[in-house]
Amino acid sequence: MNKSVCDARFRSKKSPTPVKYQLLTLMTLFITVTGCGTALMTKDPNPPVVGQPVIAGNLENPKISEASGLASSRLYPGLLWAINDGGDDPLLYAVGIDGADLGTFRVEGAKNFDWEALASFRWQGTAYLLIADVGDNWEQRQTVTLYVVKEPVITAAGIDNGRAATIAWQIRFTYEDGPLDCEAVAVDAARQRVLLLSKRRLAPVLYELALQPIDQDTIAVAHRLTAVPHLNWPTGMDLTPDGLSAVVLTYNNGYLFKRRQNEDWSNTFKRKPQRLRFDRLFQQEAVSFGFYGKSVFVTSERIPAPLVRIDLEESDKKP
């Protein structure tokens, strides 16, 4: 979320009560002085560096003005999907791996209160996109929402702008220890779990949630797995298709975590990650592995938004 939008939201929302939110008020003062997304952050870890960065292009569609989520298609190797931050219409933007504009889909029945993450996955032979409406700067939202839509199919004629995508199911949920801000969400399809990494705590916390709700009327609960103290303000997360690697984006860096076979993610995130080699972007909040899991794409909330590809294996330049 860029500073102007952040400040506007702070001004437009009803102020919390002074007694209950004293600490939050102090955080807000720091944010006002230093800029949204940079307050109370300590230095990120300095682990071994991996990857070869390439500027793949710029996001061509001018309507993608605040890219808060990025996900690789699970149908087409040359396609990425992107979303805008809160305040935009409920739209999915199709983007080439060179940043080319490939069209737009409207998500019928969804609202973009504060869309902050996008994930792609396959489940029971079908490709899906998960849109995470989980942003909560004030940590006041009693419930937040995940929208799951079938990934749109692109014909030879391409995408007609304005076509609709339908919601397959949605998950309304809360966190077991109360409201919090989150921008990093990923899907572990093999385990049928959604992973969520909190943002504004001094030590981010990893949570998990069932991918399928018990029913549409039940408010689910995301359960705490572990604190991840060596990361600062995570802004994005993704898993490889095989579920053996995770990438986490922060305002300063990107980090690669390798999971061992049959290991819980709580143990994976306790180990020291590898740091991705690329120059930090302004307000970087969107990250995705490529189709084959051999590279990572990163973009930012700005215009023009550069699309950076970090190749993880020298011998495999596939996206």
Where are these regions (language model features)?
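Sequence/structural signature of beta-propeller domains
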Residues: G37-P319
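Bacterial N-terminal signal peptides that target proteins for export
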Residues: R11-L24
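Positively charged n-region of N-terminal signal peptides that target proteins for export
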Residues: N2-K3, K20-Y21, L70
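Bacterial N-terminal signal peptides
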Residues: T25-T34
